[in-house]
A protein has these predicted regions:
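Extracellular Ig-like/FN3 beta-sandwich strand-entry sites
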Residues: 17, 112-114, 128
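Secretory/extracellular carbohydrate-interaction modules
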Residues: 1-88, 101-104, 195-203, 210-216, ...
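A generic structural signal for short, solvent-exposed coil/turn residues
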Residues: 14, 68, 125-127, 159
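Short, aromatic/His-centered strand-loop micro-motif at the edge of beta-sheets
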Residues: 89-116, 124
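Short beta-strand segments enriched in hydrophobic/aromatic residues
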Residues: 24-28, 121-123, 137, 171
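Aromatic sugar-binding interfaces of carbohydrate-active proteins
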Residues: 127-229
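Aromatic-enriched hydrophobic runs in primary sequence
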Residues: 78-82, 93-97, 115-117, 179-191
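Residues within well-ordered beta-strands of beta-sheet-rich folds
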Residues: 21-25, 114-120, 132-134
């Protein structure tokens, strides 16, 4: 596991957004990238009254693994007991064997491509929240390839917003010596603060890469990750 934290200074709190944008570029990606199972940004669906007790969510990319015919997917998931209506056929009730929602879109990954993922809090009322997750795929020259909704669903909790984002690379049980060379650029996170009509945005740079299992070279290009051999 490689963890990535973002910089939120005191005048830019890390909570209460209605939009979150995160981007990953696969600079070096083997057709069967041993040790790279999931590249994602995790965050909370958080009560806006400050009481805490929010629910975990994430959005991310599972790279293609040709060695066992896995095409690759984009995921948008909610972990909690308050799932409501599902508005996209990519979505199903349940998340990692527990309660929640998992939306999965078949999406092959390509070396050199960027995957720009957006979470929108479409609606937040006293009764519920509606959220959507989309992916914009850009080719190696930055030209758009496609834009697809990963999923859209309702959460039966009122007065909620997005908070406390962090990113990570989920590895595998393979020994460190067997990892193949992988290079990923994590771009700065873009958030839009809740109830500002889309006008109050903050671009949050990478702060730290606090933990990793097998060693990683991190350089400030966004943050570019190189690991394996």
């Amino acid at each position: 596991m490689i963890d990535i934290n973002y910089d939120f200074p005191s005048n830019r709190p890390a909570r209460y957004f209605d939009k979150l944008e995160t981007s990953f570029t696969f600079n070096k990606l083997n057709p069967s990238p041993i040790g790279t199972r999931f590249v994602a940004t995790q965050f909370w669906l958080d009560p806006t009254n400050g009481t805490g007790g929010g629910d975990t969510m994430y959005i991310g990319i599972n790279p293609t693994v040709q060695s066992y015919n896995y095409v690759g997917q984009a995921h948008f998931s909610y972990f909690g007991k308050n799932a409501g209506q599902l508005y996209n056929s990519n979505c199903n009730k349940g998340a990692d064997g527990g309660s929640g929602v998992t939306c999965a879109l078949n999406l092959p990954t390509t070396q050199g491509y960027t995957y720009h993922l957006t979470v929108n809090l479409v609606e937040s009322t006293a009764q519920h929240a509606v959220l959507s997750g989309t992916v914009d795929v850009l080719n190696a020259t930055g030209d758009p390839v496609q834009t697809v909704e990963i999923g859209k669903f309702e959460i039966l909790r009122g007065n909620m917003a997005l908070s406390f984002p962090a990113s990570w690379v989920e590895g595998s049980s393979d020994p460190c010596a067997s990892l193949v060379k992988t290079g990923i650029t994590f771009s700065p996170l873009i958030v839009t603060y809740f109830n500002t009509g889309g006008t109050d945005k903050y671009t949050s740079p990478i702060n730290t890469v606090p933990s990793n299992k097998c060693g990683v070279n991190a350089t400030p290009v966004g943050v570019r990750m190189d690991y394996g051999r």
